[in-house]
C-alpha cells in the first residue's frame, strides 16, 4: 500500500521540480525583457526631451540601416512617443505574466504540501 503512495509523491515532486525550473527560467527571461524595455523607454524619453528643445525648422534624420531619412520634428517626436507607449504596454504585459508564473508555482507547491499532509493524516 505504501509503494503506490510513494510513487505518486515522487511523481508529483518530479513534476513540481520540472515546473519550478521551467518557471524560474521564464521569470528570469521576463526580468531581462523588462530591463531591456526599460532601457528602450528611457532612451526614447531622453531623446524626445532633447528634440523638444530644438526649433521646428531643425533638419532631423532617422537612421534606417545604412542610410538616413530626412523627417520632420513632429514625425520623429511621434515615433518616440509611440516607442515609449509600446514599451510601457509590453512591460505591463510581462509583469502580469511574471505574476501569473509565480502564482502558479506557489499553487503547485501548496497542492503538494496538502497532499503530504493528507498522507500523514492517514
From Swiss-Prot:
Domain of life per record: Eukaryota
Family of this protein: Belongs to the prefoldin subunit beta family.
GO molecular function list: protein folding chaperone; unfolded protein binding
Example of a GO cellular component annotation carried by this entry: cytoplasm
Keywords: Chaperone
CDD domains reported in the protein's UniProt record: Prefoldin_1 (cd23164)
Regions crossing the membrane: none
Role according to the record: Binds specifically to cytosolic chaperonin (c-CPN) and transfers target proteins to it. Binds to nascent polypeptide chain and promotes folding in an environment in which there are many competing pathways for nonnative proteins.
Subunit-level organization: Heterohexamer of two PFD-alpha type and four PFD-beta type subunits.
Protein name: Prefoldin subunit 1
Any one of the GO BP annotations: protein folding
